[in-house]
Regions:
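Short, high-confidence coil segments that cap the C-terminus of an alpha-helix
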Residues: 182-184
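Conserved "HGTGT" condensation-loop signature of ketosynthase/thiolase-family condensing enzymes
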Residues: 1-156, 168, 176-179, 191-195, ...
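Short beta->alpha junction loops
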Residues: 159-165
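Internal active-site segments that recognize and position negatively charged phosphoryl groups
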Residues: 173
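Short aromatic-hydrophobic micro-motifs that form the base-stacking/packing surface
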Residues: 187
Length: 207
């Protein structure tokens, strides 16, 4: 018998969803490509008398009350991930079987803005006064838990965290799940955000 390799197992891309500075969805992405490069906005960094260029997702882009009604206490990182995941599932045209659908989220830094907000609160208010909601949103798997809750998915879920090639690793894992028949389809995504600490590091190390 000829040995079987994972590279022989082909995957199909069925749907795409995205949330970015230019808006939400394929149409917004197509418009952004047609417009070409757009200058970033400048955001101020606390503790530094400087402003740095960043691409910011507008608040109105995240204003989907129907979809986000279950996650009023979620942070921006999780909201962006949920909206993109819901759009990808809708774009695929699949009638999702929640038990046979997997979810893999790739991220380099996770919800690091929320993580540092939590640490700041410990310093400012002490361990006994920190909001448990902020802590629950700071863990790397929080966004995936929101995705599965909002989309009623009960299949295997995982967050892949790597500083480099996180999305490629997530695709490899999805390929394994499909080859092993753990699920019939896998929702694979990548999410990261530029928080205050990241802007500080960017200023100190890259400028």
């Amino acid at each position: 018998m000829r040995p079987w390799s994972l590279g022989e197992y082909k995957m199909n891309l069925l749907g795409i969803g995205m949330v970015f500075r230019g808006g939400r969805g394929i149409d917004c992405y197509e418009n952004a490509l047609k417009q070409g490069w757009q200058p970033p906005v400048e955001c101020e960094i606390r503790h530094l008398n400087k402003r740095l260029p960043v691409y910011v997702v507008a608040d109105e882009t995240l204003a989907d009350k129907l979809l986000l009604k279950k996650m009023r206490r979620a942070d921006r990182f999780s909201k962006m991930a949920v909206l993109a995941a819901a759009d990808a599932l809708r774009d695929s045209g699949l009638e999702s079987d929640g038990q046979r659908t997997g979810v893999i989220l790739a991220t380099s830094f996770g919800a690091h803005q929320t993580t540092f907000d939590f640490l700041d609160d410990i310093i400012d208010y002490g361990e006994g006064q920190v909001s448990p909601t902020i802590f629950s949103n700071s863990v790397h798997n929080a966004a995936v838990s929101y995705i599965t809750s909002v989309l009623d998915i009960t299949g295997p879920t995982l967050t892949v965290t790597r500083f480099s090639f996180a999305f490629q690793s997530a695709l490899q894992l999805a390929q394994l799940w499909l080859a092993d028949r753990r699920c019939d389809s896998v929702l694979v995504g990548a999410a990261d955000q530029c928080g205050e600490v990241m802007r500080y590091i960017f200023d100190r190390k890259l400028f």
